UniProtKB/Swiss-Prot annotation:
Region feature (Disordered): 186-248
Pathway field: Glycan metabolism; cellulose degradation
Molecular function terms, GO-annotated: beta-glucosidase activity
Protein known as: Probable beta-glucosidase D
The keyword Signal is assigned to this record: yes
Cited Gene3D superfamilies: Glycoside hydrolase family 3 C-terminal domain, Glycoside hydrolase, family 3, N-terminal domain, Immunoglobulins
Catalytic activity: Hydrolysis of terminal, non-reducing beta-D-glucosyl residues with release of beta-D-glucose
Keywords: Carbohydrate metabolism, Cellulose degradation, Glycoprotein, Glycosidase, Hydrolase, Polysaccharide degradation, Secreted, Signal
Active site: 324
Pfam families given in the database record: Fn3-like, Glyco_hydro_3, Glyco_hydro_3_C
A GO term from the CC aspect: extracellular region
Glycosylation-annotated residues: 53, 188, 296, 360, 384, 422, 501, 592, 646
Entry's EC annotation: 3.2.1.21
Amino acid sequence: MRVPSLSVLSFLLGTALAAASNFEAGLLSSGKVSLGDWKSAHEKASQFVAKLNTTEKIKLITGSSVTTTNGETFTALDILDGDMGAQAYYYVSAFSLSSALAMTWDKEAMYEQGRAIAAEFYGKGIQMVAGPTSQPLGRTPWGGRLVESFGPDPYLNGIATGLETRAYADVGVIAGAKHFILNEQETNRTGGMGGGGGAPGGGGMGRGAEFSSSVPGGMSPTSSAGAIPSSTSTPGGSGMGGGMAGSSAFSSSSSSGAPYSSNADDKTLHETYLWSFYDAVHSGLGGVMCAMTKVNGTLSCQSSSLLLDILKTELGFPGMVWPDTNGQQDALASAANGLDYGSSSLWSESTIEGYLESNNITEARLNDMAIRNLMGYYYVNLDNGTQPSTAAQDDYVDVRANHAKLIRSHGSKSMVLLKNKNNTLPLYKPHKMAIFGSHARAAVAGPNMQFSVEGSGPTYDGHIATDSGSGQASLPYLITPENALNIKASQDGTMLRWIANDTYSSSTGSALVMQGSSSTSVTPSVSAYSENMDVCLVFINALAGEGADRTELRNTDQDNLINEVADNCDNTVVVINTVGARILDSWIEHENVTAVLYGSLLGQESGNSIVDVLYGDVNPSGRLTYTIAKTESDYNVDICYTAQCNFTEGNYIDYRYFDAYNVTPRYEFGYGLSYTDFAYSNLHIQGPSALSTYPTGQLAVGGYEDLWDTVAKVTVTIRNAGSLDGAEVPQLYISYPDVAKQPVRQLRGFHNVYIKKGQSTKVTFELRRRDISYWDVQHQKWAVAPGTYEAWVGASSRDLRTHGSFVVKTKA
C-alpha cells in the first residue's frame, strides 16, 4: 500500500485583532454545548463570578484568591506535576511513569493508579494535577518526553488518558491534561537549539509550571498545547484558521519567544492528535495546558481555532485553558483567543480594563474566563470543604496508604517479555548467578537527585525508576534489582557475583579485588565473571526527559557489555528499562541471549517488580505500546531542527507507517510473550444497523453525544492452552473502506484478561461510533463510511489470530 503524500503546508499568521464575529466563540453562556453533569458546576461558578467586580475577576484569572462582596472566598488553586506522584513532596509515593502504565494494557490498572495518585494529591491539599500527559504522542522515537505519555497509538492513549482523568475527578481532584497539541519534541521548543524551559513566562503564577519543583508556592503554567492557523492545503479551509490575534509582531504587552511550529493538516490533527483529548474531555477534564510551541504558525496558547473553535466548541470542553512555560506571549492575543488563566505581568488590571474599554475583549469573554477557572473546582466538589489544608512540601503528612503494593503490581504487569528461548524464564533457584550493568544498582546519590538532562549522557549511571523535569516522581526509597536479587539469593541459597557497571577493565585501582582462597578467587573481568554461571543477568537503561530529545536509540557500551557476557555465558538474560524505543539488533540474535525483559520506568518498587517477573511470581502480560525497529533508519520521522516542522507523514506514525510500507520490525506494536500459551477461536460480530453518515446527537461535553454510542460488538473466545495461569491481552484491529483513507489497520479495542490454565473466557469488544468514523475535512465532521469493515483479533498488530468483517450502510 502506498500512503498518500501530504503536501507541505504554508501558513500565514493572522494580524487582525479582536474580530467581532469571534466574540461569542467558545463561550459557555452561548448554549452551543450541552453541559450535562457539568451544569451544576456552571451554575455555581456563574453565581460566584456574578458577585465579582472587574478587578476581582482579573485576580481570579491570574491565580490570586478572591473574596466576593458578601464574603465568599475562593482560594487560588494549587496545581502540581504530575501523573507519577506529587512532585517535590515528602511522604508521597513514586508511581510508575505513564508509559509503563500503558504497557500493562490493563484498564483496571490505569484507573487504579489514577485514583491512588489523586488520593495523595488530595491528602496534601493540592487541588489540580498537571496531568494526565497525553502528549507528546510519539511522532518520532527520538522525542525526549515520550516516557511521560501513553504512547503513539491514539486509541490506546485515549483510553488511558480518559481513565486517568475519570479517576482524578472521582477522588475530587481536577485533571489538567497536557500538552495541547502537536508538541512532539523538545528541540527548539523555546526557539533556541536546546529544549530550554523551566521558568514561568511571567509573574503571579504560583506552583504548577513545568519543572515545578523549582518554582515556589502558588500556581504556574505547565505543559504544552497547540493552535492551528489556516492551511492552504486544507479543503474548505474551515476549522484551521489562525484566529484573531495571531500576529508574530508582539505588542508592548508581549514576552519574547520563537518556538518551532508543528504544521499538520486537519485530517491528521483530528484522527491522530486530537483523539485522546476527546477521551479526556468526555471523562471529566477540568483543565487543559496549551503548549509553548506553535501549530501551523500560531502559538498554541493564542490560537482561536484551536482553543475556541476546536477545544471549547467541537470538543465541548467546559474547563480552563492555562499556558505552559512561555506559552503566553501576547496579552491580547491570548485573552481574545481562548486562554483562561495567565500571567499577571501580562494581564495586569490596567491592561485588561483597557481591552474592555476598547472592545478588544468583551465583558462576556472576561466572565467566561473567570467561570472556567472555577468549573473544575465545582465539578469535583472541592467546594464541600472536606479537603485537608495545603501541606508544606516537607510536612509530615503521610498519604501513601498501601500504594507500594499497587506500584509493585503495576510495575510487574507492565514488563514485556520479548524473548524466552528454551523457557529460560522464569528462574528457579539458580545455584550461581552473575549480575552486570550499572542499572542493577542504585546511583551514588539518591533516590532523588536534581540533574540537567540537556547535554547529559543517554544512559543513567544507576537504576533509573523515574524521569526528570516534569516527569520526575519523588522517590521515598528505591528498590533496585540488586536489592531484590540479594533477598532472593538469601532465600534460595544462590551464589551471586556482580559487576555493577556498563564498562569495566581490570586496571590498577579497580574496585574488584582478588581475595580469598583459590577456590573462590576470580580474575576481575566481565568474561571471567560470566563463565560457568547458571544464569547471567545484564541490566541496561536509557535516559531522556524534559529539555532535550534523545541522541541515540542504542548504546555502544551497553551493547558491548551484553555481547561480552553472552560470549561467555550460555544463559544470558537482558533486562531493559528505557524511556522509549531501544534498538536491540547488535545482540538480540546472539545464541546465548536466551531471554529479554523490557519495560519503562517503574517507580519506587522497580527492583521488586522486575524480580517478580524474572522468578515467575508474576506471569508477564505487558505489551509494547510502540514499534521496536531493526535499525534507526526504519523509522520515518526524525527530530526537526528547523523553525517549520511539517508533519508530512500525516497519520502514518509508528506501526501504521510500518504496516503501510511493509517494513518488518524487530518487535511490533502490541507484542509481548507469556510463560503460557493462548488460543483464539469463535469470532462473532454483531454489526450495526444503518447509521447516519454524520452524528445527529446534541453537541455536548466530549463532542456530539452519539459519537460515544456503541454501534457494533466483536466477541472472541480465548483459551489458556499452556501449563501456567496467566493473563492475555487480546487486541482488536479494524480496517476501513477505502473512501475513509485510513491506515491498513488501527487498534480499536483491547482487554487484559486473566485465565487459569486449561480454561477459556469470552471477550467482547464494543465499537463506538467514533471508532469507525473518519474526519471529513470538507464537511468538518466525523463521518461513517459505507462499505465493508474488516476486523482482526490477535496478540499483537501483526500476530492476528482470527478475522471477520461487517458491512455498514449509511443514510442521510
